[in-house]
Amino acid sequence: MGNPGNMQSAIQFDRFNALADEQAQERILAARSRLGSRAVLLCHHYQRADVYRHADLTGDSLKLSRLASQSNAEYIIFCGVHFMAEVADILSKPEQVSILPDLAAGCSMADMANLAKVERCWRELEEMSGDPDALFTPVTYINSSADLKAFCGEHGGIVCTSSNAPKILEWSFARRKKVLFFPDQHLGRWSGHKMGIPLDEMVVWDPDLQNG
């Protein structure tokens, strides 16, 4: 596994904002030529065309992270959002360095849950039901921050994707009676509904209310 502290960004964008598109493309091509096979450039499907054209690999975030970890590249440059580069770093070899060109590139859905909110929810569950580790399996969607993935690991939970979420819920319910799913309530509720759980039995925790 890579070290999440290995994710870097050293780009000063002000230096490039004034460049004409043609100049920017020339700079990119020159950098690619210098780095050669030492770097692999990953572009998520959502990237704009003038970035996408330079990609070595394209696809969804998990696919790209897996492919990058299998490469011999020293530098993994992920043109995507923050959690994508974190996943690439988690899956990377120890000697690989994951680089996110813009550390401000975020995902509004991933930001719907953060560690402080999840830990607060866990404490409230403890106040209401006793030991949450005995009753709840925490499940996070892969589109989430690395610290939420770590929280799930520390509490006997798991990470899911959109395609395996129903199977992950089956796994979770086989171990404990209840599931705490985040950050995407809609994926969690859809997966639960697919398992036959009535919607009125799936509670949405509200961080703005006492005891959610």
Regions found by a protein language model. Give the residues of each.
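Active-site loop-to-helix "anion-binding N-cap" substructures in soluble metabolic enzymes
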Residues: 2-212
